[in-house]
Amino acid sequence: MRLLAGWLCLSLASVWLARRMWTLRSPLTRSLYVNMTSGPGGPAAAAGGRKENHQWYVCNREKLCESLQAVFVQSYLDQGTQIFLNNSIEKSGWLFIQLYHSFVSSVFSLFMSRTSINGLLGRGSMFVFSPDQFQRLLKINPDWKTHRLLDLGAGDGEVTKIMSPHFEEIYATELSETMIWQLQKKKYRVLGINEWQNTGFQYDVISCLNLLDRCDQPLTLLKDIRSVLEPTRGRVILALVLPFHPYVENVGGKWEKPSEILEIKGQNWEEQVNSLPEVFRKAGFVIEAFTRLPYLCEGDMYNDYYVLDDAVFVLKPV
């Protein structure tokens, strides 16, 4: 019995020691990894990946038009965001898992999109807002609840999970079969891309998060959202990466320009935000509130996490 207990303790200690050694956080593994990847063709830092965290939320209000200045909500790095960052940093240090993911991605990219590969591996989760940031934007309290949420292009459902406590029924759409599998595991009702507009009922909140720049007909999508949104109390929460670079991902990871082009003008974040009220007006919406947030993605063996600049809007129908 003592021998068995001793063997068990030794095994657990060995596993713990191996994890400590073979993590990208340990000096030994960092050194080995740098030696393996240094030289021409080594990994480059992700665009924006090393920005100071406070810069993610900075907006020059003086560059906003007067109507937008009145509805801007200042956001900050909060606990929910920091938890995501900490978890992402930890995951990026799991050397063997990251090597496995890299190998699978290289092989499967020949016939699968990057999104589908991420869904298969259960990696690459996105983060748009924390529960507190979501509540502040919609001006709701933690106990607020309404009937139906529709999350368009929901991915693996991790962002849906942040919104879900406020809704009795949760619907989602997604093109990727592996992401649909992830959504179904979370017990969300997945609707087809041509089904959500024809259910016969309306939605109280529709989220369209970082989808307009990755769909073929963004203006048509906005108009379809307007047609199924509850007309009085219904709201849309919409996130858009700025500067705006619209492309559609096809199988094999190929990118093509969309058939519909949104008229978004300007060179920087504030200038492009100023052109969006007219874009939304054409689809039947006005901006009720908006903020600047980082659009975060879990990292890999090259970077702890990836980040883009998001403008997140609450739209109401007119």
UniProtKB/Swiss-Prot annotation:
Q: Which domain of life is it from?
A: Eukaryota
Signal peptide interval: 1-18
A family per Pfam:
DREV
Phenotypic consequence of residue 118 to A: Decreased binding to S-adenosyl-L-homocysteine and substrate proteins
Any one GO MF term held by the record is: protein-L-histidine N-pros-methyltransferase activity
What subcellular locations does the record give? Endoplasmic reticulum; Mitochondrion
- UniProt effect for mutating residue 214 to D: Abolished binding to S-adenosyl-L-homocysteine and substrate proteins
InterPro entries linked to this entry: METL9, SAM-dependent_MTases_sf
Which of the seven top EC classes does this enzyme belong to? transferase
Question: What outcome follows a substitution of residue 156 to A?
Answer: Abolished binding to S-adenosyl-L-homocysteine
| Phenotype for residue 123 to A | Abolished binding to substrate proteins
A single GO cellular-component term on record? mitochondrion
A single BP term in Gene Ontology? methylation
Per the record, what are the reactions this protein catalyses?
Answer: L-histidyl-[protein] + S-adenosyl-L-methionine = N(pros)-methyl-L-histidyl-[protein] + S-adenosyl-L-homocysteine + H(+)
Residues carrying covalently attached carbohydrate according to the record: 35
Q: Where mainly found?
A: endoplasmic reticulum
As for what it does, the entry says: Protein-histidine N-methyltransferase that specifically catalyzes 1-methylhistidine (pros-methylhistidine) methylation of target proteins. Specifically methylates the second His of proteins with a His-x-His (HxH) motif (where 'x' is preferably a small amino acid), while exploiting the first one as a recognition signature. Catalyzes methylation of target proteins such as S100A9, NDUFB3, SLC39A5, SLC39A7, ARMC6 and DNAJB12; 1-methylhistidine modification may affect the binding of zinc and other metals to its target proteins.
Q: Which family does it belong to?
A: Belongs to the METTL9 family.
What name does the UniProt record give this protein? Protein-L-histidine N-pros-methyltransferase
Query: Which species expresses this protein natively?
Result: Homo sapiens
Gene (name only): METTL9
